Amino acid sequence: MASVQEALAQLLTVDGAMCAALVDSTSGMLLGSAGSGLDLELAAAGNTEVVRAKLKTMKSLGLNDSIDDILITLGTQYHIIRPMAQKEGLFLYLVLDKARSNLA
């Protein structure tokens, strides 16, 4: 089984990848990171709030489902949040340079 750092390094091989992180969504704590371009500790805490807000909204709507991923499109970047199905409470966070990546 690959280590956290090896897995994050593998994510950075995606075209346009700038940085990646593994985040504990119960605490907002950064468990591992790779790459550069953002303050990943700050991003981990902020994106934990995004995940929590979506889960709360889903519960309020009575949606008995799970989040596959959350895509946030900025002017120059894509931010992808992907909860880990096999490890509840953790999510992967990947930042892509929009000009150098392709979501297809």
Over which residues does each language-model region extend?
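Non-catalytic interaction/Regulatory regions outside core domains
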Residues: 1-104
